[in-house]
Amino acid sequence: MVRTNVVSFVLFAAIVLCIGSIQIDGQKHTAPWIPEDNSICCKEHPSVGRCLPNIDDSAEKGGKCWKFCIEGCETGGFCKLFGHKHICHCNCSG
């Protein structure tokens, strides 16, 4: 009986600690011991706003997603479909 209570308490404490370490801001979902990557590449950026394919991700048309991503990533970005809407996604450089 005591062993069951100890195991239950340890599992509960582990879950509480894991939940407390997550920042829900749409950008960071990593454990605190993993080094933070400040690069905008290989990530989605909903903060850029609505992304219209072939317009906002076009270099020729000066699209806002392309402009945002080209400053930090060599290959720019594109409008990536998530569910029923497109979000600006910066390409992975390299």
UniProtKB/Swiss-Prot annotation:
It comes from the Eukaryota. One of its GO terms (cellular component) is extracellular region. Pfam families: Defensin_like. Residues 1-26 form the signal peptide. InterPro entries: Defensin-like_20-28. The keyword Secreted applies. Keywords: Antimicrobial, Disulfide bond, Fungicide, Plant defense, Secreted, Signal. It is found in: Secreted. One of its GO terms (biological process) is killing of cells of another organism. Disulfide bonds join C41-C92, C51-C79, C65-C88, C69-C90. Its main location: secreted. Belongs to the DEFL family. This is Defensin-like protein 21. It comes from Arabidopsis thaliana.
